[in-house]
Regions:
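Short, flexible active-site loops
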Residues: 220-230, 272-285
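ATP-binding N-terminal substructure of ATP-dependent carboxylate-amine bond-forming enzymes
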Residues: 1-118
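Protein kinase-like catalytic core scaffold
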Residues: 208, 256, 268-272
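Active-site nucleotide/adenylate-binding loops and adjacent lid/helix of ATP-dependent enzymes
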Residues: 109-196, 200-246, 358-359
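Active-site "cap" helix and flanking loop/linker of ATP-utilizing ligase/carboxylase catalytic domains
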Residues: 237-258, 264, 274-322
Length: 364
């Protein structure tokens, strides 16, 4: 294993930031980089990747193609990711060739729900109760009544790899439906609402956090984020402090998303960590001095972090599936429309988002 390369100097305008992954996050990162005079080179295994439409250079190859990854790295000054499920071998290879952030340790933690929860708890931060499940009988024994959620330890997002269960036998059957894939059984949290913190840490250790939004989900997919969330100033500060402790413990560089449950008693529980720009931070494009996408590029390119101050209240709503077909109405509803350039509309697929802003009314 090669030692990870460290960025010795900021990437100057005209330089190239490599982005592994070509989805909408890579697309918006590329647009933000261009505003700073930086080029992006996008690597994706999908010929119709949305980010290919807006980048300066592209590589179409598999994430297990070592030769293609090496050529990609040679063309970049720094490298980052737009999704967390990067194959470990690819992350290791790239980090030994060019400065690559977030680091491999952060990716490894975020790729495994069990490791993630153990990591967060070791920092003294609360999570939902959970137990590892390696076989059906583990699920049966771990079920403690009420409701619980069985989740695969790896490769879960937007509700994939999850089943809500209401009995020990149902938990066991759910595990069997996962075909023996390692899982965790998580106690169901009767939360008041969900929130998140999108924050950034720079190469110099500087930290900046955005105001937490309230997040509403439908069918396990984020539907809307509203800022400010109905949190007290103390809760908002606590949420940002949680994100900072996690980022510092990971020696993290880049933007990170920390998803939270807010219980009815006001307690904050960490649900998941996303080592990348986050869907619940899209509102920052219109409502903040520095968007999460510019902030991430600044961090991984070794630039000073920008100002995360929110100058407006915001409501961000995802455009999902067939809703994108009504683009005429979406383009005239008074919001800032972002369509991702995806070639095919599919049920449950995020096709874009709209953000509405209004005068700022709250502190957090």
């Amino acid at each position: 294993m090669s030692a990870a390369k460290i960025l010795s100097a900021p990437v100057a305008p005209g330089g190239t930031v490599g982005i592994l992954g070509g989805g909408q996050l890579g697309r918006m990162l590329s647009l933000a980089a261009a505003r700073l005079g930086l080029k992006t080179h996008v690597y994706s295994d999908a010929a119709d990747a949305p980010a290919f439409q807006v980048c300066a250079a592209r590589t179409l190859a598999g994430y297990d193609d070592a030769a293609a990854l090496e050529r990609f790295a040679a063309a970049c000054d720094a490298i980052t990711y737009e999704f967390e499920n990067v194959p470990a071998a690819a992350a290791e290879l790239l980090s030994g060739l060019k400065p690559t952030n977030p680091n491999a340790h952060a990716l490894a933690i975020a790729q495994d729900r069990g490791e993630e929860k153990n990591f967060v708890r070791a920092l003294g931060i609360a999570t939902a109760p959970f137990a590892p499940v390696e076989k059906a009988d583990d699920a049966r024994k771990a079920f403690a009544g009420g409701r619980a959620v069985l989740k695969t330890r790896r490769l879960g997002y937007d509700g994939k790899g999850q089943r809500t269960v209401a009995s020990a036998d149902e938990a066991a059957r759910a595990f069997e439906s996962f075909r023996g894939v390692p899982a965790i059984l998580e106690g169901f949290v009767d939360f008041a609402f969900e929130a998140s913190v999108v924050a950034a840490r720079g190469c110099d250790g500087a930290f900046a956090a955005y105001d937490p939004p309230k997040n509403d989900h439908e069918n396990h997919i984020l539907r809307r984020s509203t800022v400010p969330a109905p949190l007290s100033s103390a809760q908002a500060d606590e949420a940002k402090a949680i994100a900072r402790r996690i980022a510092e413990a990971l020696d993290y560089v880049g933007v990170i998303g920390v998803e939270l449950f807010v219980t009815k008693s006001g307690e904050l529980l960490v649900n998941e960590i996303a080592p990348r720009v986050h869907n619940s931070g899209h509102w920052t494009i219109e409502a903040c001095a520095t968007s999460q996408f510019e902030q991430h590029i600044r961090a991984v390119a070794g630039w000073p972090l920008g100002d995360p101050t929110r100058h407006s209240d915001a409501l961000m709503q995802n455009i999902v599936g067939e809703e994108a077909a009504d683009w005429r109405a979406l383009s005239s509803n008074g919001g800032a429309l972002h369509l991702y350039g995806k070639s095919e509309i599919r049920e449950g697929r995020k096709m874009g988002h709209v953000t509405w802003i209004s005068p700022k009314t709250g502190a957090g």
